[in-house]
Design a protein with these regions (language model features):
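Generic secondary-structure signature for well-ordered alpha-helical cores
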Residues: 40, 57-60, 83, 87, ...
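Primarily NTPase-proximal linker/entry elements flanking Walker-type ATP/GTP-binding cores
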Residues: 8-136, 143-164, 170-190
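Long amphipathic alpha-helical segments used for membrane anchoring, targeting, substrate engagement
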Residues: 2-19, 288-447
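Residue-level signature of catalytic and energy-coupling elements of molecular machines
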Residues: 16, 42, 78, 107, ...
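Alpha-helical transmembrane segments of polytopic integral membrane proteins
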Residues: 184, 188, 197, 342-345
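Conserved phosphate-handling catalytic cores of large alpha/beta enzymes
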Residues: 172-175, 179, 183, 195, ...
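Short, small-residue-enriched loops and turns at beta-alpha junctions
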Residues: 110, 138-141, 165-167, 192-196, ...
Length: 447
């Protein structure tokens, strides 16, 4: 995410490395490079110029403490201004009515239908709401079927009328359905449209007028950069939407849309799509995004994702098993499945400060976890509980059953054994024993 921009900004800050103090000359040189980096990232020209002018003004107006290096100060100012540029703080959905209505709008191919499903799951699992999906794309039958499949997958009800061709009537009927069945939120999925298509723009304006939505969200593909910003401007002039959702942000190496859209249309980015999984929808936090752009990671979001998958009762049960040295492949599989639910591995690793840069050019393949799962699921229940019984013939059978090699099975067994030993070491008094064996620690045996 934003890898190219992060790399360019890091190079820009190096101009100030070795400088004893901030001067107008070295600030101008640094910010010239920063502006070029922003423009290459497809940031709006006026936004880039205003941004660097503000940073320059703040940098030259600072009394730098002797303990603070000029490059460190510049990073701090750029970080704060990036967060301000993207909106300073997250903005919640305002869902005041019952049922509340959320209207989705955007171009064809922006990911509105998938986003509608993700948002329904988000509201259901994280906001304890009872959403109803309304299929109002009357031009593309495949969109209705796609929404139906997603609704079934996330176990959320859907309202659709294949005979009706007027999206206004479908949306109003969905709201009546929600009232009758006590659903508190209606998510209206509409057809994609171009801002220059007068008939379709009039149509969605009519849907908005008829349904009086609590939230109108403009859904846009982050990877389209400046085009996303220009389209947002056109849609906003017609719809006066309440917020933006950037989809496919995990594939955006530049960041032009995320950095420009708030300043150009004066509407907040409320959510970002960060992957193909239905859980891959995050509330947009400008300060955390600024952290990631500057290579500082995003520990808070990482912890939040982990907490969402955390089950206190299961954790206590696992701790007892570890202390009794009973950690088995069933537990190992459960831990892997929790990690998978948190998101793709490369994205999770990038949230750890310094790691994102280190693995930028490394191909991290999430399908490797599927191979591990296949091996474990090819074991019998007894073998999962008692991996010590896995002899050569059993390993051969497991390899054939999982489509892997015996070497793959042996590699997993070795990793499992190391994991079990480490878990045993850090549970109870094991941590103290492990520390005592480290060089320089009390209890370290002398040579």
């Amino acid at each position: 995410m934003f890898d190219n921009l992060s790399e360019r900004l890091e190079r820009s800050f190096k101009i100030l490395k070795g400088e004893g103090k901030i001067t107008e000359i070295n600030v101008a040189e640094t910010l010239k490079d920063v502006r070029r980096a922003l423009l290459d990232a497809d940031v709006n020209y006026k936004v880039a110029k205003t941004f660097t002018d503000t940073v320059k003004q703040k940098a030259l107006g600072q009394n730098v403490l002797t303990a603070v290096k000029p490059s460190q100060l510049m990073v701090k100012i750029v970080h704060d201004e990036l967060a301000t540029l993207m909106g300073s703080e997250s903005v919640d959905l305002k869902l005041e009515h019952r049922p509340s209505v959320i209207l989705m709008a955007g171009l064809n191919g922006a990911g509105k239908t998938t986003l509608a499903g993700k948002l329904a799951l988000f509201l259901k699992t994280k906001k304890n709401r009872r959403p109803l999906l309304a299929a109002c794309d009357t031009y593309r039958p495949a969109a209705i079927e796609q929404l139906r499949v997603l609704a079934e997958q996330i176990k959320v009800p859907i309202f659709m009328n294949l005979e009706e061709k007027d999206p206004v009537k479908i949306a109003l009927a969905a709201i009546q359905e929600a009232k009758a069945k006590s659903y508190d939120t209606v998510i209206v999925d509409t057809a994609g449209r171009l801002a220059i298509d007068e008939a379709l723009m009039n149509e969605i304006a009519a849907v908005k007028a008829a349904t009086s939505p609590d939230e109108t969200l403009f859904v846009v593909d982050a990877m389209t950069g400046q085009d996303a910003v220009n389209t947002a401007k056109e849609f906003n002039s017609r719809l006066d939407f309440d917020g933006v959702v950037l989809t496919k942000l995990d594939g955006d190496t530049r960041g032009g849309a995320a950095l420009s859209i708030r300043a150009v249309v004066d509407k907040p980015i409320k959510f970002v799509g960060t992957g193909e999984k239905m859980e891959a929808l995050d509330v947009f936090h400008p300060d955390r995004m600024a952290d990631r752009i500057l290579g500082m990671g995003d520990i808070i979001s990482l912890v939040e994702r982990a907490q969402e998958q955390y089950d206190e009762a299961e954790a206590r049960k696992l701790q007892r098993k570890i202390q009794k040295n009973q950690f088995d492949f069933n537990d190992f599989l459960a831990q892997l499945q929790q990690i998978k639910k948190m998101g793709n591995i490369k994205d999770l690793a990038a949230m750890i400060p310094g790691v994102g840069k280190a693995i930028k050019d490394v191909d991290v393949d999430d399908s490797a976890l599927l191979g591990v799962e296949a091996i474990i699921l090819s074991m019998t229940p007894y073998e999962r509980r008692h991996p010590e019984v896995l002899n050569a013939s059993r390993k051969t059978r497991i390899a054939k059953g999982s489509g892997k090699t015996v070497q793959d099975v042996n590699r997993l067994l070795k990793q499992f054994d190391q994991t079990r030993k480490m878990m045993k070491m850090v549970s109870g008094n094991g941590l103290r024993q492990m520390m005592s064996r480290m060089p320089g620690m009390p209890g370290m045996p002398k040579a």
